[in-house]
């Protein structure tokens, strides 16, 4: 039977310390007191405007994130154009297939509606 009492002996402040604080590669990182920095923003709008590639934050915020150029502004992915062409061709094929299936179903329904009464009428005579 597994009980928590067995684990209580092994939980010490040393085992609760994060490994990153003990790692010498990260020893230069100072621990920032979050309580002191909550009231002071790390970036103001003017600082953000100076450091970003977009220049004016207000102009940048006017852009529509639903626009594809918003996300792919300076990014070029090789083969992206061909991928878009393949997707467009696939959507066109799907639309044609759906239209053809609808027309076929409609024709079958019309044929059944016309032939069933004729067959029933002939079988009565």
Curated annotation (Swiss-Prot):
<dbReference type="Pfam" id="PF06789">
    <property type="entry name" value="MINAR1_C"/>
</dbReference>
<dbReference type="GO" id="GO:0005783">
    <property type="term" value="C:endoplasmic reticulum"/>
</dbReference>
<comment type="function">
    <text>Binds cholesterol and may regulate the distribution and homeostasis of cholesterol in hair cells. May play a role in angiogenesis.</text>
</comment>
<feature type="transmembrane region" description="Helical">
    <location>
        <begin position="100"/>
        <end position="120"/>
    </location>
</feature>
<protein>
    <recommendedName>
        <fullName>Major intrinsically disordered NOTCH2-binding receptor 1-like</fullName>
    </recommendedName>
</protein>
<dbReference type="InterPro" id="IPR009626">
    <property type="entry name" value="MINAR1-like_C"/>
</dbReference>
<dbReference type="GO" id="GO:0005765">
    <property type="term" value="C:lysosomal membrane"/>
</dbReference>
<comment type="similarity">
    <text>Belongs to the MINAR family.</text>
</comment>
<dbReference type="GO" id="GO:0001525">
    <property type="term" value="P:angiogenesis"/>
</dbReference>
<keyword id="KW-0812">Transmembrane</keyword>
<keyword id="KW-0325">Glycoprotein</keyword>
<keyword id="KW-0458">Lysosome</keyword>
<feature type="glycosylation site" description="N-linked (GlcNAc...) asparagine">
    <location>
        <position position="37"/>
    </location>
</feature>
<keyword id="KW-1133">Transmembrane helix</keyword>
<keyword id="KW-0256">Endoplasmic reticulum</keyword>
<dbReference type="GO" id="GO:0042632">
    <property type="term" value="P:cholesterol homeostasis"/>
</dbReference>
<dbReference type="GO" id="GO:0015485">
    <property type="term" value="F:cholesterol binding"/>
</dbReference>
<dbReference type="InterPro" id="IPR039706">
    <property type="entry name" value="MINAR1-like"/>
</dbReference>
<comment type="subunit">
    <text>Interacts with NOTCH2.</text>
</comment>
<dbReference type="GO" id="GO:0005789">
    <property type="term" value="C:endoplasmic reticulum membrane"/>
</dbReference>
<keyword id="KW-0472">Membrane</keyword>
